């Protein structure tokens, strides 16, 4: 990014401060923050968004439940209610981003030329009217003139975040009311995006719910400097408010719906044991990464294109760090791993970096196992990895959601996470993985276990049974120790030529270069030196 952009960014924030000063009331004390619930259903045939509102509700166990909603933007969306006017905002769930932000009603476009000195090969970006139509008509944008929103008391008044698909947002750090299914979270801090760059090749992001651990992004101070900024995460804010007792959460996703539980996980969704895998250690890592030891391809069919009547399993050594990321749609693995998988079906790796095979080279019983060690093996059907089928005179061709990843960023996205139950506990440096109960649904009765309790007796390599030997009390506060949110999915699609369509949030970013949309640029010190050079 060029230095003039950051001068411009500070000016833009100063202008924003002047224009909205009268809209803010500095009320002493902490704000009450609550999240209301809304559920939407996914139409598999039409592949279109449907929104069906439901009332606030609590699970029979007493835990608050928040439904997420399906959209066509390639992600899982949570409905977060903010403001004294209690409006609902659809925000992308992202385990690779720390900050929760929402788009402002008066959002204006950033052009590529305002951000980058060299714009060769860079999309010019969407116009202001286009962004407002996509973000504020299809979703809900934040209107700070009709709510009790106010700036935070921090000296860092603004934030700047850039993502792997080049999406860039600039805005204010805010405090306002929020609503969590009958629970109040005092003084909820979030970002309000007032300027945004979106490529015309991808869907507009209406906002993000950041589920990663706290990490440093770019901030803008009240004395007009670019500074390092570590925003409070939504998980940490729930802990600080004594709503949950541990900064951990469990995630259940499938093609239609899903569920996010802060502070706990749902035993009813799990078949067998939870396998606890160590988070990969790194001095600068702040992502939910684990070591993937190997992949096993199990073939069990014959076809017109593959002559062998019976094929044995093929073990492929990987032994590399991979990041679990709900903000990423596909699976990104080392180049030689992807090529080995393609070879098992006499397929190829396309120029776009994904596996292409004949559809009759596999059966419904074929699967790929992801092996994390200590019997932590999880199967994904090859059929479930198909993102597009193309008719051909020599036989239908299937494109798989397996991509060659960038060497600095191997990712297990939604095409993996839909087939496991995942639990994230940064403090314990553990990620729990479990096979899904085939009868699990987000509407079934919850059987919630506290993550802290589950991990007390766990050591490296051990698993925790989904059926506890002792009953555990999880009503640690008057609110309980877990929050339950449910989700619905947003699949991406692939065009006939194999390139990702604009429905995917990774279309021109992660899909082409293997970089997650959630990979925030963390370079504040560099920006300061550029600004004052």
Swiss-Prot record:
This is Aspartic proteinase sxa1. One of its GO terms (cellular component) is external side of plasma membrane. Involved in degradation or processing of the mating pheromones. Its loss may cause a persistent response to the pheromones. It may cleave the mating pheromone M-factor. May be involved in processing of zymogens that are required for zygote formation. InterPro entries: Aspartic_peptidase_A1, Aspartic_peptidase_AS, Pepsin-like_dom, PEPTIDASE_A1, Peptidase_aspartic_dom_sf. PROSITE patterns: ASP_PROTEASE, PEPTIDASE_A1. Belongs to the peptidase A1 family. It comes from Schizosaccharomyces pombe (strain 972 / ATCC 24843). One of its GO terms (biological process) is proteolysis. Pfam families: Asp. GO terms for molecular function: aspartic-type endopeptidase activity; peptidase activity. The active site is at residues 94, 325. The gene is sxa1.
